UniProtKB/Swiss-Prot annotation:
Residues annotated with 4-aspartylphosphate modification: D717
Domain HAMP: 192-244
Organism of origin: Pseudomonas protegens (strain DSM 19095 / LMG 27888 / CFBP 6595 / CHA0)
GO CC, one annotated term: plasma membrane
Keywords: ATP-binding, Cell inner membrane, Cell membrane, Kinase, Membrane, Nucleotide-binding, Phosphoprotein, Transferase, Transmembrane, Transmembrane helix, Two-component regulatory system
Keyword Kinase attributed: yes
Protein name listed in UniProt: Sensor histidine kinase GacS
GO molecular function per UniProt: ATP binding; phosphorelay sensor kinase activity
EC main group: transferase
């Protein structure tokens, strides 16, 4: 508090505060003492008056002279402070009274001495009158000295005493106030003697601060202040001299700068030339990267193209598996090359991430499958552990995520000489619409020091440069991975101990999508028992989880002999084991020994599936009865494992018989889509696979068709003019409820659906949904799933759509259009022609909706165009539609820029079509 006061205020406070406290304490003490003395005097005077009255009234009481008593009582009122007097008989009956009624009640008790009772306004006295009191009047009667003659009561008022006390207090306060006033005057005078010189010093310092260094202070009237003023004057003189020297130095420096201007100008010219050379070098680098991109992607596209052609030919399951691995490897290589070439685009923040559904377990296992040969060549064990509480169906950019995992696993393989590499996926936190995941890659390699960890995520750097020539690499992989993870809103890090290994981890938040029905256990395997042999503990644990996810009851064994004995012991019992999965290497046993054990197990009715390293598959090829179906590479993929075990339990020939029974009639399918190209494609694909199709282009026609004809399934487009897909579904469900009929399966067809939109589709009454473009395999699966009727001529499983990477997407891709049309050139041409015919109208409709600021109409028109692009080879327009629709639905401010890019993409496609016409 004192810090906020000035010197004058402090002087006043320190002077007046102690004085005031002392004056108040002393004044209060003496006033209290005086009031106490006055009260004591009042009590003594009351006792004295009572004694005097007792002597005066004793003869009258003895003679019962009432008049005398009245006269004495009246005379007693003339005494100071006496308020009332009462004279009582021995029985306390009233003999005489003078004055008003007494305020206080009589004292309690019956004492022979004087009694009193005090109140706030008066004090009441009571004294007994005995015969001895007559002695004072000279009227003593023998033997009556102790006889009670009566009582004397009087009451003294406190008002006089209080008045005298108040007068004394008032006088004390006057004296205190006078003393404080004098003290205050002295304090003010003292404060001025201190404050005025300080004010002069303050003003002088302010002038010095403003640059008036000639300012000097006069003598201030006291030794201490004069010394302070002298010091300030010396400081001002020193500052003045320093300023003069500084000004001289500035003038000299200015002259030097003026002399060096020509040199600086020459340096600026040299810097400008160097900048131009750097820009030219950057341009040359960009051209080189573009040329390299073309030169590298061209053979890769050839590999992918011929892989697709081979997949359409008659191949064994093993060959199809090899082709699938080649295709996935080529896709990964193409993606990695494009990302490296696009490193500058990542740094500029212009990289656009995809947002599509994917299966986390499949992505992780596919990554390990691609890299398994490199790991097995070094005799490393690859293990994938996906914790059971981890959601598998997520939404994100699977190709970018796979690229990151490929980089991490590849690094782990490079820098691990022996041991195990474990890929884990676990749930950290789950919300209603999203999950927080942690994916880690742990190895038993060389480990990293703290210095290596700090430099790990820098461009063109490696943890151990001494090893760079052996494993290879540019040092860009982790930098690109870190940038991609950060753009996804996640985090990447590493925990490592030199000599013990490293664990790279990713923490990422991804939206959830609906559960994948294919992940549920299927009837062929549900409840069956399987024996497992795997010497590696983590690999055995992962394999056991995979088999349990397939619906199997797993019994692990430590040796092949123990497994054979265990199966023999339960043979021909209710606990018989139908299947055996053997994870082996040549270090565990020879192919000849394995062949003998498989022969023994086959005779016990137990089908065997062998898992071995990719580098040893040729060695074990002749050890199994059917290597195409009973031999797989480590680490096992859950989907391949389920398919292989299902084939062992129920061979395809046996399973085809009930399918032929089911498919004895063709399924009747109603297709609803307002886009003629989409409607034509779905109708053609279904009819080519043997379905009976009725195609309509609006919801009203669909409702009318359902009310007049029986159907097994409805393929319903979501966004249509008039009655859209949701409204049509609700109308169909209402009509079914009125007729108490069996609900007809309705599958939504949509070009773009986020997680919340997919939930809304299912809540509106639809049973399932498919995302465009739709392949023959997807159509066959959904028809079989909801009708139980199989379609024929299902092509091999291929990715329906592959996100394009690179610096620029193609405007028109004829090969992609042919692939999306299931290899039908006429259909692909018709689809493209129908898209181009409606392109101008769609462009104008989008512009009109944008000008009218009609958000719903804008989303509807973009979605309609997006659906049409899903079946044509127009990658650039499709990507622009998808980005625009996503940003519009998210109400993102970048949506307008995306719409501008969409308009440019439409123009480029129209120009390209005219050029190729």
């Amino acid at each position: 508090m004192l810090k906020k006061l000035g010197i004058k205020g402090r002087v006043l406070l320190l002077t007046l505060l102690p004085t005031s406290l002392m004056a108040l304490v002393l004044g209060g003490y003496f006033t209290w003492m005086q009031l106490s003395d006055l009260q004591t005097q009042l009590l003594q005077r009351g006792e004295m008056i009572a004694e005097q009255l007792a002597s005066l009234v004793a003869p009258a009481m003895g003679n019962h002279n009432t008049q005398m008593l009245e006269r004495i009582a009246t005379q007693a009122l003339e005494q100071q402070d006496v308020r009332a007097v009462s004279l009582l008989a021995p029985d306390r009956s009233l003999l005489a009274h003078a004055g008003p009624s007494m305020l206080n009640p009589p004292p309690a008790g019956n004492s022979s001495h004087m009694m009193q009772r005090s109140g706030s306004d008066a004090t009441r006295y009571q004294l007994p009158v005995f015969g001895r009191h007559r002695n004072l009047a000279g009227d003593l009667i023998p033997d009556e000295s102790d006889r009670l003659l009566g009582w004397v009561e009087l009451e003294l008022s406190h008002s006089g005493m209080l008045l005298r006390g108040y007068r004394s207090l008032f006088a004390s306060l006057l004296l205190i106030a006078a003393g404080l006033a004098g003290t205050a005057l002295l304090a003010v005078r003292m404060g001025r003697t201190i404050n005025n010189p300080l004010t002069q010093i303050k003003q002088a310092v302010a002038q010095l601060k403003d640059g008036n260094l000639e300012t000097r202070l006069p003598p201030l009237g006291s030794q201490e202040l004069d010394e302070l003023a002298s010091g300030i004057n010396r400081m001002a003189s020193t500052l003045q001299n320093a300023q003069e020297e500084l000004q001289h130095s500035i003038d000299q420096a200015t002259e030097d700068v003026r002399q060096n201007l020509e040199t600086i100008e020459i340096q600026n010219i040299e810097l400008d030339l160097a900048r131009k050379e750097a820009l030219e070098a950057s341009r040359i680098k960009s051209e080189f990267l573009a040329n390299m991109s073309h030169e590298i992607r061209t053979p890769l596209n050839g590999i992918l193209g011929f892989t697709h052609l081979l997949q359409k030919s008659e191949l064994t399951p093993r060959q199809l598996d090899y082709l699938g691995t080649i295709e996935k490897s080529a896709d990964s290589l193409l993606g990695i090359i494009n990302e490296i070439l696009d490193f500058s685009k990542i740094e500029a923040g212009k990289l656009v991430l995809d947002s599509i559904p994917f299966n986390l377990r499949d992505l992780l296992q596919d990554t390990l499958t691609i890299l398994a040969p490199a790991a097995h060549a070094k005799q490393l064990e690859l293990v994938s552990l996906v914790y059971r509480d981890t959601p598998l169906s997520l939404v994100g950019d699977p190709l970018r995520l796979k690229q990151i995992l490929t980089n991490l696993v590849s690094n782990a393989i490079k820098f691990t000489r022996e041991g195990t590499i474990v890929a884990r996926a676990m749930l950290e936190e789950e919300h209603e619409d999203s999950v927080q995941l942690r994916i880690s890659i742990q190895d038993t390699g060389i480990g990293l020091s703290n210095q290596d960890v700090r430099a790990l995520f820098q461009a063109f750097s490696q943890a151990d440069n001494s090893l760079s020539r052996q494993p290879g690499g540019t040092g860009l992989g982790l930098v690109i991975s870190k940038r991609l993870i950060e753009q996804m809103g996640g985090e990447i890090g590493v925990d490592s101990t030199p000599g013990e290994g490293s664990e790279f981890w990713i923490s990422l938040n991804l939206p959830k999508t609906r559960d994948d029905a294919e992940d549920l256990p299927g009837p062929p395997l549900l409840g069956r028992r399987v024996a497992v042999l795997e010497n590696h503990e983590l690999a055995r644990q992962a394999l056991q989880h995979q088999l349990e996810d397939c619906g199997l009851e797993v019994t692990p064994f430590n040796t092949l002999e123990a497994l054979t004995n265990g199966i023999t012991g339960v043979h021909q019992s209710e606990q018989a084991i139908d299947l055996a999965v053997l994870g082996i290497t040549t270090n565990d046993m020879s192919p000849e020994r394995l062949s003998q054990h498989i022969w023994d197990l086959e005779h016990l009715g137990c089908k065997v599936l062998v898992l071995c390293p990719t580098t040893e598959q040729t060695l074990f090829h002749l050890s199994v009865p059917n290597p195409h179906s009973q031999l797989q590479a480590k680490p096992a993929c859950t989907r391949k494992l389920r398919r292989a075990l299902s084939d062992l339990v129920t061979p395809r020939r046996a399973r085809s018989e009930p399918e032929e029974t089911l498919s004895s009639r063709a399924p009747r399918v109603l297709c609803v889509d307002d886009n003629p190209a989409n409607l034509l494609l779905i109708q053609t694909l279904l009819e080519d696979m043997g379905a009976k199709v009725l195609a309509v282009d609006n919801g009203y026609a669909a409702l009318n068709a359902i009310q007049t004809e029986p159907f097994d399934l409805v393929m319903m487009d979501v966004q249509m003019p008039g009655m859209d897909g949701r409204q049509s579904t609700e109308a169909i469900r209402q009509w079914e409820s009125e007729r108490h009929g069996t609900p007809l399966p309705i599958v939504a067809l949509t070009a773009h659906a986020m997680a919340n939109e997919k939930r809304a589709l299912l809540q509106s009454g639809m049973d399932d949904y498919l995302t465009k473009p739709i392949s023959e395999r997807q159509l066959a699966q959904v028809v079989l799933k909801w009708t139980g009727l199989a379609l024929r001529n299902q092509g091999p499983e291929r990715a329906s759509e592959r996100p394009e990477l690179g610096l620029e997407l193609q405007v028109l891709d004829q090969d992609e259009g042919l692939r999306l049309a299931a290899g039908k050139a006429d259909l692909a041409a018709d689809m493209l022609a129908m898209l181009l015919a409606s392109l101008d109208a769609d462009r104008e409709a989008i512009k009109a909706a944008r000008a009218a600021n009609d958000q719903n109409a804008l989303i509807e028109r973009v979605h309609r165009l997006h659906g049409a692009t899903r079946y044509c080879g127009v990658p650039q327009l499709r990507a622009a539609c998808q980005r625009s629709e996503t940003l519009l639905k998210q109400e993102d401010a970048k949506a307008f820029a995306a719409l501008d890019e969409l308009d440019h993409a439409i123009g480029r496609l129209a120009a390209e079509a005219r050029t190729n016409a």
